[in-house]
Amino acid sequence: MKPTQSSAVGPGQTVPNGASPSGNGKLSGVEPPVLGGPEHSDYYLLDNLITDEQRALRKKVREFMDQEVTPIINPYWERAEFPFELVPKLAQLNIAGFQIAGHGCPGMSNLTAGLVILELARGDLSMSTFMGVHSALAMTSIGLLGSEEQKERFLPPMARLEKIGAFGLTEP
C-alpha cells in the first residue's frame, strides 16, 4: 500500500485498516476511495461495518438502477408518467416488503433496507418513492395490522409486485 493523503489523528484515537500514525500526527498508508464507487464519500469508513451480503445487494440494486432506470427515466419525468414496464424487472430484485419476514418478503434488517432505499434514490427518486409507498407504507401496514388471512391474501402478490400498494389522500 502506497502512502497517500492522510488525515489528522488525535491522542487516544485509533487508526483504520492497519494504518499507522506518522510522527506528525497524520495517517500514512491509507488508500483513497475509488472515484465513483460507493466508498467515494464514505469518510468515516462505515462501509467496513456492513456485511458482504449487504454489499452484494447494494451492488445489485445499484446496477439495476444504472442499467435499467437512469438511461430511460428523464422522458418519464417530462411526461409526468411512471415507467410501469420496469416493475417486472424491479420484482426480480426481490426487495419488495423490505423488513417483512415471510409471505415472500425478504425480511431485511433496517440497515439493509436503508442501503436498498439509498441506492434506489441515488438512481431516481420516483423509484425510491414508489418502493417506499409500496413496501414501507402499504405492505408494512398489512404486515403489522392485517389478519393472517389478509397477510396471506395480499403480501405474496405484493412481494412479487403483481399487486401494487398505494396511498390516497383527500382534503376537505
Task: Show where each model-derived region lies.
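Mature N-terminal segment immediately following signal peptide/propeptide cleavage
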Residues: 48-72
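Glycine-rich flavin
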Residues: 63, 68-172
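Alpha-helical interaction segments
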Residues: 33-34, 43-44, 54, 66-67, ...
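Intrinsic disorder at enzyme termini
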Residues: 1-53
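Short basic coil micro-motifs at the edges of alpha-helical modules that engage polyanionic partners
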Residues: 46-47, 54, 79, 105
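A ubiquitous short alpha-helical element
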Residues: 26-28, 53-59, 123-125
